[in-house]
From Swiss-Prot:
SUPFAM superfamilies: Cadherin-like (SSF49313), Dystroglycan, domain 2 (SSF111006). Residues 379-498, 722-744, 821-893 are annotated as: Disordered. Residues 47-69 are annotated as: O-glycosylated at one site. It comes from Mus musculus (Mouse). This is Dystroglycan 1. Disruption phenotype: Homozygous null mice embryos exhibit gross developmental abnormalities, beginning around 6.5 days of gestation, in the Reichert's membrane, an extraembryonic basement membrane. In peripheral nerves, ablation of DAG1 from 4 week-old mice causes abnormalities in nerve structure and function including mildly impaired sorting of axons, dysmyelination, axonal loss and aberrant nerve conduction. Laminin-binding is lost and there is disruption of the Schwann cell dystroglycan complex. Residues 830-844 have a biased composition (Polar residues).
Length: 893
């Protein structure tokens, strides 16, 4: 009881305060005392419930999670209160309603209980998310306990832009960027990344935004991340731009942007050095994990809200004002939320109203938003029921225009009967020229709104009478739920040409595409060019045919084509822009088709033989463009302009093309080898990656890569061995090494080896020159040496140059050798008895015989004595005429 008494004291205090507030309320609103008392009772009941809730056992109920909204390109984050759904020991499962997994753009973190993601343009619409709790059963299966379903509606990229800017921040003191005025452009900084958002998981997208948030210190809700559309990486309206660290774009590209201010220019833009320098030097790329292609700053025009069309609650009787409604008021779109016993979402039925952008007003008001000069006037007779006119059906008394543009005829607004709820029928009713007075049609129950028909061309020959009801009826009062003057009475104005397309350049065999800029035309009612209907025509108001080499997609407003050699020259086309009212503006421009960009100088020619008949490919421009796109995709190039189609011939389908990314000079052999290995093996068999890129439209049979231009002597992938009768072809170079090793070998081959050879030649030449010089100088004396030996004479030997170690020989010692042998005996003469020799010539001996036998008693011949003194008449040098001593006599050992 003490606890109860302690709890009742604050209860009585609260009761006293409530009674005091009731008294004050009664003093101010004495006419409604019952409401104040009833409000007091409710507050008292709530107070009692809050005091005694701790002592009551809570009944497990399903807690509803509020619905959420997301915007394309913006981060979405919501915390799921799992503690209110699941108790201890239960497992939380989050998935799409009726499915096993979440949508592809959402990520669930079971630890932090946060559901986050970043939707793309393909994720627009309403997504129903189911949060269920399950308990592990005895058999190991999960037994569902409770479940809750909520919805997330994804709006387009330009929807509700200021709300994302004015998002509440976690820090109360944080300065939230102010929204710009309605007509004021928003200055946006955009960073281009070499990434593909479609290949990322939701977690990777959010992590990319978080890394950019930590790098740039920009709040997460202020950043936008969208993929690149139509290869438009850079904005042509940017007034500031800079490069990144990426040299080549590989992926599709992603644009990460945030707001800088309102209508800034180059002088008033804030300091961007924190983006410019890191993007160029690679610091931003290292932080984000993706290469940065560049950045730019541009002013974006705000997107004007589209005028909405609503059903008109009117009666067939013309009155000055619309009275109270007699039909049931349509309820806003409803959604079926499953209970814990049936967690599945029921399929949509015929009782569900069509989705609308804004809630349907509760009061019976009429909102009329028309485009063009359309005046709501009552008709003279009963209104005909809605009729769907088939193609080729002629309605009597009706003006039939010569040209009907589909997609711009307004739907007929109908009145919903009081007891039924139907979907809005999407039918169009032509306006009758003369009101019908047939009595059989006087019981009309579904009056129709005045339809919008295209303006008739003056060439119409129908002359049916037309009744103009402009002043015969009283003016109709129109109520609108929004402020502003209705535009129903304003005349439709013709679109204006703001910026000419002027000229488009194209090359033979190269695919091109041109996105019509949004500022080309402008219409006061329909605004920019992307809201208008564009049509490409020839000079004679003739539409471009399906087989023309130039095609135009009116939905994406993209002009593309693939010219061949017969289209070289200048071609004139006309772009017609038509608004919703049928008025149009025209811009004339020229397409200049040039010859092939590389001509016959391409370093390599790629040739592929495909299965099938070449005639359908040659005659169908769409198939040719598809083939070029597939070839570019097989090489890893997203830009199709890198492929130049040379020829398509017979022999199945023989396609010959060149790659515009290869340099012309010098021969890029390594790059060609790399491209060849990517699509085929050494024998010319297509690789699986190349075949998969062409399938299912084309099937590759064989591939050949032949050098041309600077590489004309090389053949990289042979198609077939040369025939015996043909001349000897150059040897095929089969690359059997890695490209890096081949590059190093080329460096040695073209740089190191020639340098060594030249150095060796110079060294040998130097050695030969030095030898020749030394040989020529040998035997020649210098001037000093020549001066020394210029006089002839006996050399002078000084006294100190003599060897005096041995004493001179004594005079008593004979001058002959001590071991000298005795002299030979004297010769024998012919007078001796036995001659020692026999004359060689007997005739000669016979001549001298009488001389020997003349005097036998004569003495033997005695030789004369030797000379002891010089002969007279010959002078000799006097003694001691030289200043040096004679050398010592020879002394035998």
């Amino acid at each position: 009881m003490s606890v109860d008494n302690w709890l009742l004291h604050p209860l009585w205090g609260q009761t006293f305060l409530l009674l005091l507030s009731v008294a004050v309320a009664q003093a101010h609103w004495p006419s409604e005392p019952s409401e104040a008392v009833r409000d007091w009772k409710n507050q008292l009941e709530a107070s009692m419930h809050s005091v005694l809730s701790d002592f009551q056992e809570a009944v497990p109920t399903v807690v509803g999670i509020p619905d959420g909204t997301a915007v394309v390109g913006r981060s979405f984050r919501v915390s799921i209160p799992t503690d209110l759904i699941a108790s201890s020991g239960e497992i939380i499962k989050v998935s799409a309603a009726g499915k096993e997994a979440l949508p592809s753009w959402l990520h669930w973190d079971p630890h932090s209980h946060i559901l986050e993601g970043l939707p793309l343009d393909t994720d627009k619409g309403v997504h129903y998310i189911s949060v269920s709790a399950a308990r592990l059963g005895a058999n190991g299966s999960h037994v569902p306990q409770t479940s809750s379903v909520f919805s997330i509606e994804v709006y387009p990229e330009d929807h509700n832009e200021p709300q994302s800017v004015r998002a509440a921040s976690s820090d109360p003191g944080e300065v939230v960027p102010s929204a710009c005025a309605a007509d004021e452009p928003v200055t946006v900084l955009t960073v281009i990344l070499d990434a593909d958002l479609t290949k990322m998981t939701p977690k990777q997208r959010i992590d990319l935004l978080n890394r950019m948030q930590s790098f740039s210190e920009v709040e997460l809700h202020n950043m936008k991340l969208v993929p690149v559309v139509n290869n438009r990486l850079f904005d042509m309206s940017a007034f500031m731009a800079g490069p990144g660290n990426a040299k080549k774009v590989v992926e599709n590209g992603a644009l990460l942007s945030w707001k800088l201010g309102c209508s800034l220019n180059q002088n008033s833009v804030p300091d961007i050095r924190g983006v410019e320098t890191p993007a160029r030097e690679g610091a931003m790329s290292a932080q984000l994990g993706y290469p940065v292609v560049g950045w730019h700053i541009a002013n974006k025009k705000p997107t004007l809200p589209k005028r909405l069309r609503r059903q008109i609650h009117a009666t067939p009787t013309p009155v000055t004002a619309i009275g109270p409604p007699t039909t049931a008021i349509q309820e806003p779109p409803s959604r079926i939320v499953p209970t814990p016993t049936s967690p599945a979402i029921a399929p949509p039925t015929e009782t569900m109203a069509p989705p609308v952008r804004d809630p349907v007003p509760g009061k019976p008001t009429v909102t009329i938003r028309t485009r063009g000069a359309i005046i709501q006037t009552p008709t003279l007779g009963p209104i005909q029921p809605t009729r769907v006119s088939e193609a080729g059906t002629t309605v009597p008394g009706q003006i039939r225009p010569t040209l009907t543009i589909p997609g711009y005829v307004e739907p007929t607004a109908v009145i919903t009967p009081p007891t039924t709820t139907t979907k809005k029928p999407r039918v169009s009713t032509p306006k009758p020229a003369t009101p019908s007075t047939d009595s059989s049609t006087t019981t009309t129950r579904r009056p129709t709104k005045k339809p919008r028909t295209p303006r008739p061309v003056p060439r119409v020959t129908t002359k049916a009478p037309i009744t103009r009801l402009e002043t015969a009826s009283p003016p109709t009062r129109i109520r609108t739920t929004t402020s502003g003057v209705p535009r129903g009475g304003e005349p439709n104005q013709r679109p204006e040409l703001k910026n000419h397309i002027d000229r488009v350049d194209a090359w033979v065999g190269t695919y091109f595409e041109v996105k019509i800029p949004s500022d080309t035309f402008y219409d006061n009612e329909d605004t920019t060019t992307d809201k208008l209907k564009l049509t490409l025509k020839l000079r004679e108001q003739q539409l471009v045919g399906e087989k023309s080499w130039v095609q135009f997609n009116s939905n994406s407003q993209l002009m593309y084509g693939l010219p061949d050699s017969s289209h070289v020259g200048k071609h004139e086309y006309f772009m017609h822009a038509t608004d919703k009212g049928g008025l149009s503006a025209v811009d004339a421009f020229e397409i200049h088709v040039h010859k092939r960009p590389q001509g016959d100088k391409a370093p390599a020619r790629f040739k592929a033989r495909l299965a099938g008949d070449p005639a359908p490919v040659v005659n169908d421009i769409h198939k040719k463009i598809a083939l070029v796109k597939k070839l570019a995709f097989a090489f890893g190039d997203r830009n199709c302009s890198s492929i130049t189609l040379q020829n398509i011939t017979r022999g199945s389908i023989v396609v010959e093309w060149t790659n515009n990314t290869l340099p012309l000079e010098p021969c890029p052999k390594e790059q060609i080898i790399g491209l060849s290995r990517r699509i085929a093996d050494e024998n010319g068999k297509p690789r699986p990656a190349f075949s998969n890129a062409l399938e299912p439209d084309f099937k590759a049979l064989s591939i050949a890569v032949t050098g041309s231009g600077s590489c004309r002597h090389l053949q990289f992938i042979p198609v077939a061995p040369p025939s015996p009768g043909s001349s000897a072809a150059p040897a095929t170079e089969v690359p059997d090494r890695d490209p890096e090793k081949s590059s190093e070998d080329d460096v040695y081959l073209h740089t190191v080896i020639p340098a060594v050879v030249v150095a060796a030649i110079l060294l040998i030449a130097g050695i030969i020159a030095m030898i020749c010089y030394r040989k020529k100088r040998k035997g020649k004396l210098t001037l000093e040496d020549q001066a020394t030996f210029i006089k002839k004479g006996v050399p002078i030997i000084f006294a100190d140059e003599l060897d005096d170690s041995k004493p001179p020989p004594s005079s008593s010692m004979p001058l002959i050798l001590q071991e000298e042998k005795a002299p030979l005996p004297p010769p024998e003469y012919p007078n001796q008895s036995m001659p020692e020799t026999t004359p060689l010539n007997q005739d000669t001996v016979g001549e001298y015989t009488p001389l020997r036998d003349e005097d036998p008693n004569a003495p033997p011949y005695q030789p004369p004595p030797p000379f002891t003194a010089p002969m007279e008449g010959k002078g000799s040098r006097p003694k001691n005429m030289t200043p040096y001593r004679s050398p010592p006599p020879y002394v035998p050992p």
